Amino acid sequence: PMRHRLLIESRAIGPSPLCRLWPMQTTRTFPTMTVPTNSHREPPAPQLLRVATYNIHKGVQGLGPTRRLEIHNLGLAVEQMDADIVCLQEVRKMNRREAEYFRRWPDVPQADFLAPEGYRAVYQTNAFTRHGEHGNALLTRWPVITHQHEDMSDHRFEQRGLLHVEVMFQGRPVHAIVVHLGLIPGSRVRQIQQLQRFIEREIPPGAPLVVAGDFNDWGSQLKRMLASYGLYEFESQDASTLTYPARLPLAQLDHVYVRGLTPLGLHVPQGRVWWRMSDHLPLIAEFRF
């Protein structure tokens, strides 16, 4: 689909131009992070891997009759990230109620709709609901070797899962795992333990590994657990990496952890354009082999 401007749609007002996505409104940046403004997407410099993670809130913001369809804006946002790997959570495969409500609801699953030209979309459902299903997705401009899904549901009230995708990045295999952990602290601990067992079972010890997503963790317990498994992220010294809630971020719930790669920097886009699209802000990280 053509994406030439940001659009906003609600049931009441219909589609209208919002504003141009670029340049991003950013109040805080890292010197190592540059997001290009050119429209065509060339791969970054050799051996530099850019990974983004984004909880897209199922492509809809707001409640009741004032809710807005943001999936078109999110498509532009993903394109402008210019990432090698984009890890998405709360991605709808389909939803009959929303498709009937919004005139501009895409006629393809959200993962396919959000994938920029030349990218491959890999999706797996975590949750089945009355009107549809949603889960995790990974978008990449590099060849996909294999992919698999594992159920991580810890109790019957939350359906969770991990998506594992192996991509061939500049001739080297890189493993990426997309996660969306539970709301209960004990569940998250058990899910991290399950993640570790999955890594030990499915991923070669020396292979570069990325684990990204919405960890739903307001503290540092999971960070310590992941560090004990050899997974680390870029350590920021200020509040520039807070991602939730998008309008006034108080915590960094979204992370990109790696093994076998060197973290170089993080970037969290700021501003009204971004907090209107989802309840989370995206997080973009760069790594060096």
Question: Locations of the language-model features?
Answer:
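Metal-dependent phosphoester-hydrolase catalytic domains
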Residues: S10, M24-S39, E166-M168, R197-L209, ...
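Solvent-exposed loop/turn segments connecting transmembrane beta-strands
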Residues: R130-H131, H155-Q159, P185-S187, W275-M277
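Conserved beta strand-loop-helix elements of the APE1-like EEP
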Residues: A115-G118, H131-T146, P249-L264, F287-R288
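Active-site environment of divalent metal-dependent phosphoester hydrolases
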Residues: K58-Q61, K93-R96, T129-G132, I184-S187, ...
